[in-house]
Amino acid sequence: MKGLLQRVRGARVEVAGEIVGAIDQGLLVLVAVEPEDTREQADKLLHKLLNYRVFSDEQGKMNLSLKDVGGGLLLVSQFTLAADTRSGMRPSFSTAAPPALGAELFDYLLQQAQGQHADVASGRFGADMQVHLVNDGPVTFLLQI
C-alpha cells in the first residue's frame, strides 16, 4: 500500500463539477492499493498518516503530526500510483490491486480514519476526479507500507 502525502493549506476533490470532499490545513493523501495489501497494512498506513511529523513547531522544525495540529485528512484513491514504470513508454497497472480489492481496502481505510480523526474527507473511488490543492512547502512524502 502506498500513500503519497502532501502537506496542504487547503484541498478539495470534485466529481462532475460537484465538491465531494474538502479540507483546510492538513494532508492530502493519494492512496494506491496493491494486490497483496491487507487491512493490517491499511491500519499501519493510517497510524503513520495521523502521527507522521510533517508540520512545523514554533522553532520551524517538522515536529508536529496531523493529530497535533488538528488538521484535515483528505484521502483520494489513485491506482496509477501503483503503476510499474520501470520499462517501456507506457505504465503497466498489473501492480495495482483489482478494483474490488482496491475499493474494499480504500473504504476500510476511510472508515478507520473517520473513527480515529475528527476532520476526514475523501474523493470517490473509481471516479474521474479533479483535485485542487494549495501545497504548503511543498512538503511531499511517499509512504510505502
Curated annotation (Swiss-Prot):
Enzyme class: hydrolase
UniProt motif Gly-cisPro motif, important for rejection of L-amino acids: location: 137-138
GO CC field: cytoplasm
Entry EC number(s): 3.1.1.96
Keyword Transcription on entry: no
Cystine residue pairs: none
GO molecular function, one term: D-tyrosyl-tRNA(Tyr) deacylase activity
Domain of life, per lineage: Bacteria
InterPro entries: Daa-tRNA_deacyls_DTD, DTD-like_sf
Entry's localization field: Cytoplasm
UniProt keyword annotations, A-Z: Cytoplasm, Hydrolase, RNA-binding, tRNA-binding
Catalytic activity: glycyl-tRNA(Ala) + H2O = tRNA(Ala) + glycine + H(+); a D-aminoacyl-tRNA + H2O = a tRNA + a D-alpha-amino acid + H(+)
Pfam families on file: Tyr_Deacylase (PF02580)
One record GO biological process: D-amino acid catabolic process
SUPFAM superfamilies (alphabetical): DTD-like (SSF69500)
Family: Belongs to the DTD family.
Annotated domain remarks: A Gly-cisPro motif from one monomer fits into the active site of the other monomer to allow specific chiral rejection of L-amino acids.
Role: An aminoacyl-tRNA editing enzyme that deacylates mischarged D-aminoacyl-tRNAs. Also deacylates mischarged glycyl-tRNA(Ala), protecting cells against glycine mischarging by AlaRS. Acts via tRNA-based rather than protein-based catalysis; rejects L-amino acids rather than detecting D-amino acids in the active site. By recycling D-aminoacyl-tRNA to D-amino acids and free tRNA molecules, this enzyme counteracts the toxicity associated with the formation of D-aminoacyl-tRNA entities in vivo and helps enforce protein L-homochirality.
Quaternary structure annotation from Swiss-Prot or TrEMBL: Homodimer.
Protein's recorded name: D-aminoacyl-tRNA deacylase
Gene label: dtd
